[in-house]
């Protein structure tokens, strides 16, 4: 690995294959010149590589056999000594040691430089390490190192200072006036080396510490702290500063930079050879010039060229232009070898190509069992070759491997018999790229099939996200017994029924199967056999076989539990095919996709894994059979266009004409017009959609005997496909048979003119053109987003790769409180969904009897959830990864249930990686979502009222209101909230009331479901007068602060406030008494003055009398754009990366009363006044929408304007727990909007990693520095030590890091270097002499051993297995193996 040339990699065990397992840690540090000479087997003196006539390496050249070892095994260069018998002899003629040629991969050489050079990494990696240590600016340092300026080493009697950088001219001026002896200057790396050698680090450390404590300036403190960090790193690591300047350069082994002969007598060479040659040439020339005593200027130039050559070797292109090869391509330097996707880390250490693998196209295998896959015979023959050879020898068909090979090549009959024996019950792995989560690789038992395509079981397609339109999959063969056991026990498709992301079944029938099951379980009136009563299920089957009863007929059956059920014949057919032990209720319904998923989930919980697998296979078989028998197809006639479509469109068109007229007359603004038009069309589209659904979803059935009719659920094929969840949705049906509706522009704005036709009628050219606009954006997005999503996943994996379950219980006393998630009164996620699979922190008491129902540390399973719902618990405090006290990783109780297995998580589980995959995987799914709707604008009709969704009692919080002329209460301000609570006092729904809403209920009023609570104008924001009085205008100047518009039809004029340039005007309306004194508001102590923002329309005249509750002005609300995940994925990344949001909200840092204080510097000024303490003022930019009204009360952390708050602000004002909850909610919001379920705990694991560092505010007696970022665990440990010694402990404040930052500051430098910014990470690590204890997963993969998790968890690895002697007894296990599928359940 090419780190060696740059650093020593000192490992605490020799890197021998057996000892790699026992490796405890790896240390990296700067190589001293002595070290480099010690590694070297000789000095490379000549730039020659090989002799072009003899093809033998040149002596003392870059490929010299004397230094690096022989080219041929056990043969010296001149051919005097050959073969093993001379092993270890050094040939006296050519000086080559007789040894194996592989030493040419490990022996290093060196180059003795004629002049020292600076190591470019320590010079150019920002902040420059050499610069920081000498306290020099980067520019000055470069001038000195590249022989552009002098540096003063000893000022003597001059007025210059030591380490001052002077130009050639200044130097000559000084020399004229002064005797040269006492005055010393230097140039180049030599001078810098001298300065570094002189440094006394201990003294420097002490003086820096004192200075840092005494200084008041923050910038200076920062600078000193930075320098102090570097000084401390050198002292603690034992590295010397002068080692950053090199006298000797290591030469890496020749086999790692090979010279390969091509045909035609030319050679292909590694770029490193060119770079080394350049260094050697310049070095030799410099030596010669120095021996000849050449002029100073020539030597100086040569030294600069040597420095540049070494720079290019280490990091080409870091400084100046990159040195290019013969073809104009920049040469690949040592740094390029290790960094980036093609570098050593990511290309060869983290991702390797493996043998015993193959790939082919996949086709569906409808006859397979869930644990099987079809493997083409040709492929199997190639993959299992060694097994076949050995078996041929064993059975005596071949005596040598060579003859076995021939038999296999001839494909004799015996080969196929042996192949089928070898393959039987041998698990193989199937993988589909991109592998976005762990279900992208699963194990199956192969069945040999003819043809060349791999057959895949249809139910695992969802996990692989595979379809059969030409997808390919790769096959891998696990070789060792351990690998085979892991495949069977952990990776078998039958053991992966639940999704690790949310615990719901991932093996769920889809498409044809769903359609078949739906068709079987639908009922229809007046079918043959309706009303028959059967004594048992077998009787029904017999009746169906004898054609006495139709499968849709409504019948009654006595089931095994003795009850008589109303059901259909088809449902009994399904029931008969299922494994025993499941309740009949699970299938006694119309089996839509949702119901089937519930059935599979219930089966898993009730009957166990084996029964579920059998169930899934039976459902597949029944579903396919009946989908075929039903013969459901699509015809154009099935798309029924509603009769009322024309009327609805005509009504909408006339409404739009009205709105257009109002706009032309100036009654409404452009924004209002746009909003209203879009709203009209949205409503029309929804009306047509519901009309179409009504017509397509029901049909009238006639009894042939009695002529009686009944309305049934429709058997329209398109409706059945959509309703069952097999294919297609409401939106797509609407576009086919209703109207396509509004389309969106690429910017997300909605185009005002909708497409009124549907696909059955066909689109006009113009309509087609309108629809291409949004559709094209969908396609472009897909391409871009896939890459973005993959990058997000990579960052997530990197930040949590070392989060493993380390212990069972960390003993924490802290947790998080969880409630249901609501939005606009709707429950988006109820409490039971959020707490399922978590662990209780506190015991739960019965609200009435006060006895403990569930003790602390109870795992909340389905039973507990049901019980909690019954007794009506509204919020629960659970343990969480966020509050887990484990030093490394998390503990099992804080994590809770392993979602994919349904029991408490095992110790050693890689919960971090699972979390990253669960969040990253849907990202890619979501990216693909946009273009399926084909760019049609999905927009809700603007909401303009609240209706009660539950019965209960009204509770109003912070609601201020005034009564208007009609006796209706109008809400003032935006901080008011309305909730409905039930008898137990649990909150069932909660709404934020908008300013100016008409409130129809009172505090404490009992309401029933459906009661009208409040309504408002969705397009306008009203300004409501709070008192009776007379209007007085201030700063309303025509043409300057407002514009008058005349309405032609009504001859009424309206005044609209315009953007005014000067800040001296503050247009406002005040309400005065008869004497002209401004009156007080009712809701607060401030005067009744209303500032008018730009765009507000005034509804009153100056001097007019108004009453409380009158609307004196209104401001049209902003237009809404369509949301899709394209907004969503960047939003998720923005949150995880802790970036400043684009629409950043202003957050109040304190609690208090808000007052508007006019404007300053073109911004609006808000002042928040607390009860005690100083008020804080906030400047709000003009365009920003303010969320609070004058006189509102705000809490610390409340948003004063619209938009998203910055995460650092939340951390400062509300603390860590609130920030964590906010992050979880915001990220879930994005995924929930797309209908993707991810368990909270996955996001919590990632947020835990973002919050794992803290910033030191006061170091106390510790060695920390002010502003240093420290790991919480290390901080705690250090403080405990300090307290024991009786010194003052350090204090710190919480810190939130973005995932990239968190990955780069991880304790493992190997992991960080393989992530991003490789050179920077390695430079800083080597400077500190860092140790990597190999605790994470990536470090272990890189050093080539098993990951310390799962079966490779260290504590499991160290267990001794003792097998007690047993008496012979019949082996039940083997008998059971005969019944397939083989399933081994492992208990936690």
UniProtKB/Swiss-Prot annotation:
One of its GO terms (cellular component) is DNA-directed RNA polymerase complex. Zn(2+) 2 binds at residues 810, 884, 891, 894. One of its GO terms (molecular function) is zinc ion binding. Transmembrane segments: none annotated. It catalyses: RNA(n) + a ribonucleoside 5'-triphosphate = RNA(n+1) + diphosphate. Keywords: DNA-directed RNA polymerase, Magnesium, Metal-binding, Nucleotidyltransferase, Transcription, Transferase, Zinc. It comes from the Bacteria. SUPFAM superfamilies: beta and beta-prime subunits of DNA dependent RNA-polymerase. It is an enzyme of class 2 (transferase). Its EC number is 2.7.7.6. Mg(2+) binds at residues 467, 469, 471. The RNAP catalytic core consists of 2 alpha, 1 beta, 1 beta' and 1 omega subunit. When a sigma factor is associated with the core the holoenzyme is formed, which can initiate transcription. DNA-dependent RNA polymerase catalyzes the transcription of DNA into RNA using the four ribonucleoside triphosphates as substrates. This is DNA-directed RNA polymerase subunit beta'. It comes from Lawsonia intracellularis (strain PHE/MN1-00).
